[in-house]
Amino acid sequence: MIFKSFILGNLVSLCMKIININSVVVVGLYYGFLTTFSIGPSYLFLLRAQVMEEGTENKVSATTGFITGQLVMFISIYYAPLHLALGRPHTITVLALPYLFFNFFWNNHKHFFDYGSTPRNSMRNFSIQCVFLNNLILQLFNYFILQSSMLARLVNIYMFRCNNNILFLTSSFVGWLIGHILLIKWLGLVLVWIRQNNYIRSNKYLVSEFINYMARIFSILLFITCVYYLGRIPSPFFSTKLTETLKKEQQKVEDEDIETVNQMPPLGLEKREQEQEGSNIKDFYYFSEEMVNLNNNKIDIDETEKKLVNGKKDELYPRLKITETGYKKIPIFEESSIININENPYNSRFKILNKKFEKKNLLIKEKLFVNLIFDKNRWNRPFRYIKNTHFEGATRNEMSQFFFNICENDGKERISFTYLSSLSFFLEMIKKKINSHKLEKALTNKLSNFWLYTNKKSIKNFTDEFINRIEALDKKFISYNILETRTRLCNDNYTKEYLSKKYDPLLNRSYQKTIYINLSTPILKKTPTINLIDNFGINRIHGILLSYTDCQEFEQKIKRFYKKQLSTEIVDLLTFISKVVIELGPDSLNCKIFSDVKIIKKFLLYLLTQIVTNVNDPKIIKKSTRIKKICKKVLRWSYKLITELEQQSGEYYENIPIDHQIRSRKSKSVVIFTTTKDNTDSNLYTNDQADTDEVLIHYSQQSDFQRGIIKGSMRSQRRKIFNLNLFQANVHSLIFLDRIKKKPIFFFDISESIKLIFRNWACIGKGESFKILKYTEKQTKREEKKEKNKKREKARIEIAEAWDTIPLAQVIRSCVLLIQSTFRKYIILPSLIIAKNIIHILLFQLPEWAEDFREWDKEVHIKCTYNGVPLSKTNFSINWLTEGIQIKILFPFYLKTWNKSKLVSSQKNLIKKQKSNFCFLTVWGMEAKLPFDSPRKQLSLFNFINFVKFGKLNKKFIKLSKETIKWVKKKKKDYLISNQIIHESLSKNPSLSWINYSFKEMDLADQTSKILNQTERISKDKKQVTIKIFNILCENKINYNTKKRLEKWKILIRKSERIIIKLLFFFKFFIERIYTNFFLSSINILKINKEIFIKLIKKIIDKSIFNNERKQELINTKNKNPILFISKLLYNISNSKKNSYTFYGLDLYYVSQAYVFYKLSQVLVSNSYKFRADLQHLINYNYKRIPPFFKPEKKDFLKTQGVVDLNFGDKKFKNYAINKWKFWLREHYKYSLSQKKRPILISEKCRTVHWRNIASKKNNRYDLLSYKILNSKNKTKTEFFLNKSSSQKNNKQEIFYISKNIPLKIFMRNIHIHKKNYFNNNIKNIVRFGTLYMEYIEKMANRKYFDWKIINFLSKKKIYIETFIIINTNKNQNNKIIFNKDLYYFIISEKNISNSKKGFFYWMKMNAKILNHPIFNLENWFFPEFILLYNAYKIKPWFIKNKLLFINFTINKNSSKTINEKKGPTGREDLGSVLILSQKKDIEESYERSEKEKRKKQYKNKTEAELDFFLKRCFLFQLRFSDTLNKRMINNIKIYCLLLRLIDPRKIIISSIHKREINLDIIPIRKNLILTELIKNGVLIIETIRFSRKYGQFSMYQTIGISLINKNKQQTNKKYQDQIYFSKKKKFNLLFPENILSFRRRKKLRILICLNSKNVNDIDINPIFWNEKKIKKNIQVSYDNKNIDVYKKKLIKLKLFIWPNYRLEDLACMNRYWFYTNNGSRFNMLRVHLYPRLKFYE
């Protein structure tokens, strides 16, 4: 039985019963279901709780808050205070915006209020409470995604209609709840599908990334809502306020009224005085809304003074003090025919005044803040401003055409048309003051009897009307009584006269008009009344309202008309007119009759609708000729606003605002005429000229939706808009769809298609049924031209208006036009002229420089207005950026292939030139005839080049085509002749020899003919060229020198024939030069990074400052012969420029040092190396000998330059000392490598701020170091050594400058590593520095000396860093390393952990397990106590300065002297003894350290090495765990690294615990870890690092370093310039520029001398002809050996003196890259990376 009740039929019947019984439930459900689609900002938090998976508690709190918020919104519909609080926009501005911004910042910092989860009392958790409040509060704000204004209107309408409002609200809430549940269920299904997807489940970290992205999206959406609300309603405090000009005038009038009230006599005396004065009353008006407003101080209801009215004791009314206010004559705007109530304070006649002003003023002061935020009149401006000749002031938004209120009709309350809402409000105030019990008793009996009487009366009137209509039909009269009557407004109860249609508000709007009737004299004579001109009565409603008062002067005397007599006359008149119309017809009737009838009708209606009062009454309006109409004064603001046009025209001279406040339509003022006037001022006796302009305002044709809107007003969102087209400029509503001329999208006109079909049939068919008009060709062309011109004009107007509509478009366009004009005038056209003339020169034709530049000078650019009117430079408009400009080009330049001779041109050509005399410049740099016109065609550079290239080819092609045509014709003739019947021969096989012989003859004949033709053509061309030149010379009448020039020209022509043969090779060389010098450099320039560009600018500025300082120092130094010295320098510079090699087209800043060495080595071979490869290629591959076209002079020149030898064998290189560098660099040159192993060369990134600060502090220290290095000549130790292997198996040389105490950082710092491929095979040889260094320093090194931060670990792929360092002793057996201890610092002695070779780099295997996330900064999570110490470690370096910095305090000074005296080098072979000394010192110093290292524990496991690196990477202390915890702790640390970057790491921790990735036994439960307990238990072993030893040198260095820090980077301290030590034995007779220069310049000088190789007596050290027996192993480059020839000593001194002669350009190349660096100017001879700016990808 229960199941049967749920059958579908029963459910349907139940629903039908509900619908039939009460439709409120259905409508409420429908409305509630619709509200689910009006999505608000609270949905963001609800979706966030569902998607972000914050737990069930958060989800439940979000849903409950959301539902309660929606319930409050539904209750606010029924409950008025909530509706006022939530529906006003003030709540959004004051409450919503701060709350939304707070939520936005709170969601960005999620853990701000997160105090942890408490499972027992979850409601006490603050985070859950915040989720509930967010969903509750944000639900109360207005919706923003889907507009709910239509739904709100439906609710308001239905709430008036339905009786059971509570049932409607509950049903709507239930409907919304159903829709909400369906929405949440659908969202849950989507989320379940996402979670169960296999792809998402397979990726572990995809969910965490998705959560991160969703959190960002929610925060962005929340920020958008904040911005949306902020733009929708302006802020109350920062918006511009209106200047209340009218309020000030109103206040003056009110002050005058108060004075009249205080001096007011009694009513009787006032009447007498007014009668005597003859004062006139113009209008009577009643209470307005502003009278009731508390701010106006008008209300005073005195409860003590009460008086009986009309002799009735039951009804009590308060006594009202009524006064009259005098005012000016102001016209009244008659808009609608409602009760004539004036809302303007000017026209108010009755004002209720207050006695006590003090209390009201206090009340106003208390409510200032409330009115500021919740002001009834609103703080901001209205939306529109209605204004005409009769009316000014902004209209209130609350005002409407009709007012509705609840009134009683037939004993029932119904909505009907009533008076203003202000009067109802005033009536409610009166009712509160009167006793309600007495009022109800008095009105109950009256109301019931009154409604019964009215019902009976209406029935009687209906029956009488029906009888009268039947009688009128029987008589066949066309009268008014025949028609059916309707409800109209009655004017008088006695006469039963009604208002006319013009004054009846219940009729349509079209009848309501303002009509002024001027009564003529003949009509006035016919009227029964005599005093109609002087006396007219006031409106009946005023009399009704004034009848309640006890004032006798307002009693009315009604003059009655006899209705029967007047009605019979009217009926007779109408019947007479109808008969005339029937008999004669409407056409024959005279118009004068109708005109007279209309006047009579109006006059009679006027008589019927007026009531005459007492003639002797002083309040009668005299001398009035207008009919008063019932009108309604619209509520207005007291602001006086003006438009932009009014402000410019200056109509308002008094009380003009500073700025216009109403937005006018977008327009442009076009100046038509300007006049100058002389203004004389009598007071000042000065004459001033004032310019007056006649301006024409041009409005754009496009729609402007902002016109008429007041600045700062609230913008209403446009609704009810229908788009007809894809792109629609104007907004249309569906109501006005019939008025649109445009056709809709899918509109199809059938008639036009039918016409086209029949027209085609008529053309095809022979019949003449359809005659088509035939126009002449001229007429059709004219029409087509007109249509084209019209289309072009329309297009121009549309483009011009489009520029106006786009914001800031005119500014951009005007700037672009100015740029285009300068670019055209000074860049494009001169470059075209240059290109043209260069092509002429290349083609051996005369250039036309003068003619082209003369025409270029004629082109003038004139700035015009936006419409194209030219302007002078003085009268240029100030607002040209906003208004827009045009640029007119007079005599535009056109590039011509040949400038013809100036002959007399025809009239047609002159007319054409005049037409094309000017043009307008477009934005794209093109030319147009008119502004915004389509650009015309013009000859571009490419067209010119194509014309030049293919001009002659076209001529040749035409000639060849003519010849081929002739040949084809001949062949045809021969074929016709030879096409005869040929009998078969007897021999079937003819002889083949004949056929071959004939073919050979034909070929030879063709070839000979072609050669003859070519020779003839060449001779003809020569003759033509010579004749042209001769004619040109004759025309110009050149002197005798022209003959010589002609002869030279003939010689050039002969030489051109030879060059034509060589053109192929010339173009080949030319293309290669362009490619190497132009394209490569341009590609490189485009790849410059921004950071490098900024760094370059900074360094250039620093360099210029440095050079200026050095120049001043050089000037101040004493120089015996400065003039001779400078002259020699200049001479040497000029010679060096001629003979030296320069890098063409390359930016020297980005050339690596190794590349510079390589190029220098190539330069030393020959100065003409640039063309050497091309010439050798030509010689070897094409000719195998010197080409025949080379003259003997050229051959000798090539031989002298060393490009070509007679034997063409392997030439021996010239003698120079840099050969080792060249061969080493040639091995490692990047082009010799394979493409797979080619390095990925990326631009070097700027160093971090930390390293820059260190570099700035170290700069002066490195200057000191460089000074010690360069001034160490007196020592026996050598500075530079070139080391080579004794064996020649591999024929390779490796040059190292390695000291024992050099940190590995110096070698590895400049290795640039790409993210994808860290260490390629091409860097292996370079990395051997590190391996060799590690092997020779006790076979063990500490990881702290290597700067691992240089390597970029941010790769996403697996990295195999094991290839970085190759520990293989076999590869380095042939290399002999020499250590020099004096060049670099000595390192702090520290403990090494293990002696195993794998222990140092084996940690890098953990990089194979790097996941797709970066390695994070782990310095803050483990032990925060070590952060300060770690920062201190960053600042302090691991090594201190070398002993060379402190000469007075050297260790083992005496021992070194004795060794040097006993075992000093005697020759070149003895130079290696210095190496043995340095090795012995190293062994002695490292002995103590090796003993300490043996005592330490060594790591055996890989995990220990990994952990040790991890801890040393991040902390200052060395932390080690016990052996049992190593593996588990490392796994935990890896997971911690992942969790640090996650927003919500809780769930990943849980999943990792389930997977047993994290061991909870290791993690301590306590919140605060105690280090002492961990150390006691043996979990952690903390070993402090031993700090550096503080010797005397160290303290002295610190004191000196403080004074050097504050100096500039390029400055050097003058104290150290005095500490130059010279040997006492040596005497310098010659002035050395080396001693005058600074430290850095000396370094450059020394190395330039080392690079010099121009010595005749030097040994040839070419490896091909090298002999080991003749040459010593260690060659000294700095020439410090005593056993050097005297000749060489003199040569060295000469080189030192004239050092600029040697590689000045090379010095410029090496200046930046090698020595002069911002990071400390380290003395690194090698910069490893080649071409840092190029990028090569595999």
Curated annotation (Swiss-Prot):
GO terms for cellular component: plastid membrane. The keyword Zinc does not apply. Its main location: plastid. Keywords: Membrane, Plastid, Protein transport, Transmembrane, Transmembrane helix, Transport. It is found in: Plastid membrane. It comes from the Eukaryota. GO terms for biological process: protein transport. It is a multi-pass membrane protein. InterPro entries: TIC214. The chain crosses the membrane at residues 25-45, 66-86, 89-109, 126-146, 174-194, 210-230, 1059-1079. The keyword Membrane applies. It holds the Pfam family Ycf1. Signal peptide: none annotated. Involved in protein precursor import into plasts. May be part of an intermediate translocation complex acting as a protein-conducting channel at the plastid membrane. Part of the Tic complex. Belongs to the TIC214 family. This is Protein TIC 214. It comes from Epifagus virginiana. The gene is TIC214.
